Curated annotation (Swiss-Prot):
Family: Belongs to the class-II aminoacyl-tRNA synthetase family.
Subcellular location: Cytoplasm
Protein biosynthesis recorded as keyword: yes
UniProt KW keywords: Aminoacyl-tRNA synthetase, ATP-binding, Cytoplasm, Ligase, Nucleotide-binding, Protein biosynthesis
Disulfide bonding pattern of the chain: none
Broad EC category: ligase
Protein name: Glycine--tRNA ligase beta subunit
HAMAP family: Gly_tRNA_synth_beta
Chemical reaction(s) catalysed: tRNA(Gly) + glycine + ATP = glycyl-tRNA(Gly) + AMP + diphosphate
Gene that this polypeptide is encoded by: glyS
Organism: Idiomarina loihiensis (strain ATCC BAA-735 / DSM 15497 / L2-TR)
Length: 688
């Protein structure tokens, strides 16, 4: 079977940078699926994307489908012929549709009857014919939320399409998509090669593009940008602030990345670095540079899409653009410093948190009280925690945060230090937002933890308290993120706090504002539910998580210890047998109508196996209860694993449902004692 390399390229106007990778990957997936569905094999498939093109290159794809032998079954013989043996209309119609006569048909005999049969060879179609449908389906499946039209065209796409190239080796394939016909013309770089070029062979595609100053490979552009930016930063004696999203976005904006260094007035460094970084990265897509101590340098690196004969002109242009933005940040900082954070708290009363829950000012006062209570439990500085809680939202009404919302918290820290607040208070103001996203840093001090926990609890309790529970993808108050941040802080900072107590304290702070009487229970259940995805991400199996959830531990640190202990227990040789035994015991007890107390009468023990089990259960109780009380669940489960053999022997030799009611109830009490031992840690009957 002949094979050749296939190229499909759409030449467009500038594609949205944040959508470029998903468009590329989706086009690749669509073409790949189309070829596989057409049963056309190939060696490999690569996708390319630049601001002005989407392309797929398929290596060594079959140029034609293989012929297929097919069998088409017709009507049953008793339907195909009448009583005289003459073909019926049904038989003749079927034969005609297959291009044969009834007499030319074969017979298919099975144990269920006999049918007319036509064996035919279906000739495979050429890829040059099939590619139109494959491409149409792939384009239709692209993730384009808002397609647009252009010129007089009725076609719709994410951006106007100007060229289409579909080639098989050196052959141009006749195809049309989005009212654009396939041609050999390929767009070059907008400035370096505006004339484009005619492609003579698929194998020359990447080479010819590079000649036209286009790096088609998205990942190669990323590597080029990272390498060049790091090199220039090193020449400045610094290092670039890592930001993979920024690199990816810039790579989606250029076809021929060229890195240049520019500078700004050193006087701007009197402004905290965070708003300067936000200005350079988010507004201008520049790469700020820090020294080895984390101090911002008065230089930045930027990527241009052109190799200029006069790069100084480009550098000066970018310096001119960034200067007023940095000046704005400087003005906001100097202006904001004239007003203390404490005096801004009153202004928070005019900023709405939620209609039924009041203002941000109300929230800050609740956070302050709750943070003090939490700090007391953590033996932290109560006054500092209360102070930080009161001031933690005050920077929201500053000019800087109004202009650069990403700097909330960190600007609060700078303003607090400027006001003479203690470093403990200032750090807590910044860190109370932590963690801000998955994998982010956690609050570092106990005081910061107290304020962070209070803030998240206030949001969770407040929103649940008015019945606005997250549903599906809707979570406008980011309650899932708040819940996970709260749990991570408690677990990873090893803060042994009880959720029931925390929730009760938070509910108290709302007075009569909450309409949901079960809010504390609802939030508790919601928090425990967030453990599941968190532990799954860590490789903990669902059955282990469920076994601990069944016990509903109210301290997240305790929950964590149990999960890790059960995960370790599950790998023991005895785990499967004991899990099955616990399940069996649970079923037996569930079916019993007797009142089971766990009190075992030794005089009623008749079989050696039940006597042995009772003795060992008592011994194990004495050994594991102190371990459980100390949170040493792994050690406790190791002791419990030694019950495997006596439990197996009990079920092998003892009839639980004895005829004698007293003996039966006594045995149920023994099983109850056994089950309770395991349930002190987790419901291991749920282990798979």
């Amino acid at each position: 079977m002949q094979k050749e390399n296939l190229l499909i390229e759409l030449g467009t106007e500038e594609l949205p940078p944040k959508a470029l990778k998903s468009l590329r990957d989706s086009l690749k997936s669509g073409i790949e699926s189309g070829l596989k569905n057409a049963e056309l094999s190939f060696d490999s498939i690569e996708a390319y994307a630049t601001p002005r093109r989407l392309a797929v290159l398929v290596k060594q794809v079959e140029t034609e489908q293989q012929d297929k032998e097919v069998e088409k079954r017709g009507p049953a013989i008793n339907v195909a012929f009448d009583d005289t043996g003459k073909p019926t209309k049904a038989a003749e119609g079927w034969a005609r549709s297959n291009g044969i006569t009834v007499e030319q048909a074969d017979r298919l005999k099975t144990d269920k009857g006999e049918w007319l049969l036509h064996k035919a060879t279906v000739k495979g179609q050429a890829l040059s014919v099939l590619v139109q449908g494959i491409l149409e389906a792939a384009i239709k499946a692209l993730p384009i939320p808002k397609p647009m039209r252009w010129g007089d065209s009725t076609a719709q796409f994410i951006r106007p399409v100007h060229t289409l190239t579909v080639m098989l080796g050196s052959e141009l394939i006749d195809a049309e998509i989005l009212e654009t016909k396939s041609a050999r013309f390929i767009q070059g770089h907008r400035f370096h090669s505006p004339q484009g070029f005619e492609l003579d062979h698929v194998d020359n595609y990447l080479f010819k593009l590079r000649e036209a100053k286009v790096i088609a490979n998205f990942e190669e552009r990323i590597e080029t940008i990272q390498s060049e930016v790091s090199r220039l930063a090193s020449e400045l004696g610094g290092q670039v602030i890592q930001d993979d999203e920024l690199v990816e976005e810039v790579a989606a904006l250029v076809e021929w990345p060229v890195a240049l260094t520019a500078s700004f007035d050193q006087g701007f460094l009197a402004v905290p670095k965070e708003p300067l970084i936000v200005t350079m990265k988010d507004d201008q897509r520049y790469f700020p540079v820090e020294d080895g101590k984390g101090n911002l340098l008065p230089q930045f690196i930027f990527i241009t899409n052109i190799e200029s004969r006069d790069p100084q002109q480009i550098i000066k242009g970018n310096e001119k653009v960034v200067r007023p933005r940095l000046a704005d940040a400087q003005f906001f900082f100097e202006s904001d410093k004239k007003v203390t954070l404490e005096s801004r708290v009153a202004a928070l009363d005019s900023v709405l948190f939620q209609k039924q829950l009041g203002s941000i000012g109300d929230k800050a006062r609740r956070i302050s009280v709750l943070a003090g209570k939490i700090a007391n439990q953590l033996t932290a500085d109560v006054k500092a925690s209360e102070r930080a809680g009161l001031l933690c939202k005050a920077d929201l009404v500053s000019d800087m945060v109004s202009e650069f919302p990403e700097t909330q918290g960190v600007m609060g820290k700078h303003y607090a230090l400027n006001d003479g607040e203690s470093p403990v208070v200032a750090e807590a103001i910044e860190q109370h937002y932590w963690p801000r996203f998955s994998g982010d840093e956690l609050p570092l001090t106990k005081e910061a933890c107290a304020v962070a926990l209070a803030d998240k609890l206030d949001t969770l309790v407040g929103i649940f308290g008015i019945g606005q529970v997250p549903k599906g993808d809707r979570d406008p108050f980011a309650l899932r993120r708040a819940a996970l941040g709260l749990l991570r802080t408690l677990v990873e900072r090893k803060l042994s706090l009880d959720l029931h107590e925390l929730l009760a304290a938070s509910v108290e702070g709302f007075g009569d504002k909450l309409s949901n009487n079960t809010v504390a229970t609802d939030v508790f259940d919601f928090l425990l539910g967030r453990f599941r995805p968190w532990y799954q991400d860590q490789g903990i199996t669902v059955d282990v998580i469920q076994s601990v959830l069944a016990r509903s531990p109210s301290k997240p640190t305790d929950f964590d210890q149990r999960v890790k202990a059960v995960q370790s227990f599950k790998s023991m040789d005895s785990a499967a047998s004991l899990a099955a035994a616990n399940k069996r015991v649970g079923n037996i007890l569930a079916k019993s109508d007797e009142e089971i107390s766990g009190n075992v009468d030794e005089a009623l023990l008749q079989e050696e196996s039940e006597t042995t089990l009772y003795r060992l259960v008592k011994q194990t109780e004495g050994a594991v209860k102190p371990l459980i009380a100390a949170g040493k669940y792994s050690d406790a489960l190791t002791h419990l694993s030694e019950l495997k053999e006596p439990v197996d022997a009990f079920f092998e030799h003892v009839m639980v449902n004895a005829d004698d009611d007293k003996v039966r109830i006594n045995r149920l009490n023994l099983l109850f004692r056994l089950r309770q031992l395991f349930l002190e840690i987790a419901d291991i009957s749920l282990l798979q």
